């Protein structure tokens, strides 16, 4: 029994009526057992068709219902769609409500939409030349670290975040461990080597999902690389990369980058490694097209 089915079954015991309010984000499934809004729809359609469903009319994207549709998922239930039920303003990135849409466009390979959104997000002030919500690009890790240090003030938190599949960042001196001391990473101060401030240990999508920091260095590895006009899915095991062909695993990997690109409250810088021609696991061609793709979108490089 799935978690949605279990909860609905429990609420279904009420003799008169009951309401379940679900706040479900799209594209947040990053591991086995996570199925998002689709699992709620399945539970209602297959086991509780007498329940009425009131939902947003904008849940048509792949990150919500895959290749299906709301009507197909809920063919046995009564459905009421309303634009007013779509929570489109991000409470995480309070300086720009378009950050999530920009992240979606990037990972979808939607260059045109990403290019259109980028200047609307950063909003450069003509008087001060400062960005409202900076999103930058670099191929120098030290430059990325210096940027987040310099732009933050007081107790504003910064750190490095990376995909759990970013195994070769180790060559740059950045470890992405399976487990970190989360409370120390997020809460401890600049005098603790285990805190995010030291930028030696990166938090993966599993550790930062549902949380956020003020400024982030988003390290973009070769696991989700842009190649010949589209993103490819890759896994590092042993001493080499291999393609990921399972559609479910591909979706988890894509969503991992969606999570990473939406964790910064006030801005972030994307670090794309240069690679190393003498290291077959860090071949520059694994990174160059991703970098060029982001440059073509217009992301400002420092």
Annotate the PLM regions:
Residues 19, 201-302:
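C-terminal accessory regions
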Residues 1-7, 34-41, 67-71, 141-142, ...:
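Well-ordered, non-membrane alpha-helical segments in soluble/globular domains
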């Amino acid at each position: 029994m799935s978690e949605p089915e279990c909860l609905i079954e429990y609420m279904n015991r009420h003799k008169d009526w009951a309401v379940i309010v679900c706040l479900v984000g799209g594209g947040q499934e990053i591991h086995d057992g996570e199925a998002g809004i689709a699992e709620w729809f399945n539970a209602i359609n297959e086991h509780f068709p007498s329940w009425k469903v009131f939902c947003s009319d904008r849940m048509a994207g792949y990150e919500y219902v895959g290749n299906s549709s709301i009507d197909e998922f809920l063919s046995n239930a009564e459905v009421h769609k309303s634009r007013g039920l779509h929570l489109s303003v991000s409470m995480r990135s309070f300086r720009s409500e378009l950050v999530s849409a920009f992240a979606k466009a990037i990972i979808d390979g939607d260059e045109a939409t990403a290019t259109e959104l980028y200047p609307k997000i950063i909003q450069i002030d003509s008087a001060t030349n400062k960005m409202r919500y900076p999103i930058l690009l670099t191929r120098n890790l030290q430059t990325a670290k210096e940027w987040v240090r310099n732009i933050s003030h007081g107790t504003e938190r910064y750190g490095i975040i990376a995909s759990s599949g970013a195994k070769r960042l180790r060559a740059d001196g950045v470890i992405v461990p399976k487990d970190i001391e989360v409370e120390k990473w997020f809460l401890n101060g600049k005098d603790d080597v285990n805190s995010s401030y030291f930028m030696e240990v990166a938090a993966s999508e599993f550790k930062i999902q549902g949380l956020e920091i003020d400024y982030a260095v988003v390290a973009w590895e070769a696991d989700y690389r842009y190649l010949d006009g589209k993103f490819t899915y890759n896994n590092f095991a042993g001493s080499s990369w291999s393609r990921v062909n399972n559609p479910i695993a591909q979706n988890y990997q894509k969503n991992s980058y969606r999570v990473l690109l939406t964790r910064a409250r006030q801005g972030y810088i994307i670090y794309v490694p240069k690679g190393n021609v003498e290291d077959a696991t860090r071949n520059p061609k694994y990174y160059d097209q991703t970098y060029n793709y982001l440059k073509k979108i217009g992301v400002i490089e420092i």
